[in-house]
Amino acid sequence: MRARPQVCEALLFALALHTGVCYGIKWLALSKTPAALALNQTQHCKQLEGLVSAQVQLCRSNLELMRTIVHAARGAMKACRRAFADMRWNCSSIELAPNYLLDLERGTRESAFVYALSAATISHTIARACTSGDLPGCSCGPVPGEPPGPGNRWGGCADNLSYGLLMGAKFSDAPMKVKKTGSQANKLMRLHNSEVGRQALRASLETKCKCHGVSGSCSIRTCWKGLQELQDVAADLKTRYLSATKVVHRPMGTRKHLVPKDLDIRPVKDSELVYLQSSPDFCMKNEKVGSHGTQDRQCNKTSNGSDSCDLMCCGRGYNPYTDRVVERCHCKYHWCCYVTCRRCERTVERYVCK
């Protein structure tokens, strides 16, 4: 007796959700770690959700790092939601960690972005924690070897990018290095995209300066190397998401490599995000493919971008509604030195997709 197609489809869907295909970003479930869990004893490591055994071991040997990694998980989720707030796929499924839907379980363009962002975020958060003195195992970054420029001097406390990259990669890449978890093609794709995220973070390191001098003359400036804000790194990765390359796992010499599907005469660039499977249009709700749909999503009637009602609503139309907004108004500056404002209320028209 042959199984019905619907039964087979349901079984395959359930299997995809429980085979550990997406172990690499299950650690983002640390965002749900309760504040009551102090994370000051090694036995706490086993209580953390979404970790593979190698990450549990890293937790035990670097216990002081775990509170920072919890902050990184929360930061990655927030940055993803902000970066894609104006898109059909709005990264809401990242909050289902560790039990993702197929938009992040499979080798999609969306999972490529999340792997890159999570790798960048954990390294960014650790590097900044070193600078702020929150981690006993690290301190400020090294003084650069190049000259600081005329009128400048190196000083301050640089973000410790090298330590952030080292510990971030150890933790976030650990699941992809576990044997018998997912296909080799998926592992290669996820490791590649994670490295793209770290590359974007390296590119965000810039010289920051503070002026010194009499009456603000800025006769000398103290400078240091600092990372851009995480949202700027996320914006860079979103640009790479929009131009991501579809790849296939193909033999080249004695081993298989990821090569562009349509341009397989050239290797994959180190700077580009790659994906193995095409995504749906995310117009209609369909959990089998990880789509939440865009019904009831807010859209912008006057925009020509991805948040426009035409694009966001997929041609289904939209419904208007009115909203009351309370804001500061009639502000006055008083000498010296404060501002007083009144509170004004106005009505605005908004639109949601049918």
Curated annotation (Swiss-Prot):
GO molecular function, one term: signaling receptor binding
Name of the protein this chain belongs to: Protein Wnt-11
GO terms classed as biological process: adrenal gland development; animal organ morphogenesis; apoptotic process; artery morphogenesis; atrial septum development; bicellular tight junction assembly; bone mineralization; canonical Wnt signaling pathway
Species of provenance: Mus musculus
Subcellular localization(s) per the UniProt record: Secreted, Extracellular space, Extracellular matrix
Function: Ligand for members of the frizzled family of seven transmembrane receptors. Probable developmental protein. May be a signaling molecule which affects the development of discrete regions of tissues. Is likely to signal over only few cell diameters.
Keyword annotations: Developmental protein, Disulfide bond, Extracellular matrix, Glycoprotein, Lipoprotein, Secreted, Signal, Wnt signaling pathway
Gene for this chain: Wnt11
Positions annotated as glycosylated: 40, 90, 160, 300, 304
